[in-house]
Amino acid sequence: MLLEETLKSCPIVKRGEYHYFIHPISDGVPVVEPKLLREVATRIIKIGDFEGATKLVTAEAMGIPLVTTLSLYTDIPYVIMRKREYKLPGEIPVFQSTGYSKGQLYLNGIEKGDKVVIIDDVISTGGTMIAIIDALKRAGAEIKDIICVIERGEGKKIVEEKTGYKIKTLVKIDVVDGKVVIL
């Protein structure tokens, strides 16, 4: 599969003690090939529960190409949790803490009773996903499914234990000796 092939060959950047993998799906660089995006979207559709979903939800930034592609395939509109406040009526702010940053995310466009599928590029610490789930619950949405393309670290387990929601992923990885390893 192209996703796994490109992960195995992607560059690794060390910041402090953490090794970041740089990949088109997680970073948008060096280039996002349509065939990779198509493969990822098709695989998400195969494992996801989109039946009756009224909205797809992601956080900016790298979930945006994923939900755009999925929206075109499924005809389900999408909502992006943004990093800046718009002060629209009903906007829900939520604190987000990840392995590399802390800040607010803002949810707009979700109505009570919406049936949503959450899509994200990577789950590693779980901080972004916990923030998304919290905001959606506060908005009164029903979470139908949660799908992340790449799983790294303990974030999936942390989110599942903390929220009770199961998270589906396409591939689980680690970085060992300066290379991505598929687990």
From Swiss-Prot:
Family matches, as NCBIfam families: HPT_Archaea (NF040646), PRK02304.1-4 (NF002635)
Catalytic activity: IMP + diphosphate = hypoxanthine + 5-phospho-alpha-D-ribose 1-diphosphate; GMP + diphosphate = guanine + 5-phospho-alpha-D-ribose 1-diphosphate
Function description: Catalyzes a salvage reaction resulting in the formation of IMP that is energically less costly than de novo synthesis.
The keyword Transferase is annotated on this UniProt entry: yes
Gene that encodes it: hpt
One GO process term, biological-process aspect: IMP salvage
Gene Ontology MF annotations: guanine phosphoribosyltransferase activity; hypoxanthine phosphoribosyltransferase activity
Primary location: cytoplasm
EC number: 2.4.2.8
Subunit structure: Homodimer.
Cell compartments where the protein resides: Cytoplasm
Protein name: Hypoxanthine/guanine phosphoribosyltransferase
Region forming the signal peptide: none
Pathway in which the depicted protein is active: Purine metabolism; IMP biosynthesis via salvage pathway; IMP from hypoxanthine: step 1/1
Record-linked CDD domains: PRTases_typeI
Record keywords, A-Z: Cytoplasm, Glycosyltransferase, Purine salvage, Transferase
GO cellular component: cytoplasm
Keyword Transcription regulation: no
UniProt-listed PROSITE patterns: PUR_PYR_PR_TRANSFER
UniProt family annotation: Belongs to the purine/pyrimidine phosphoribosyltransferase family. Archaeal HPRT subfamily.
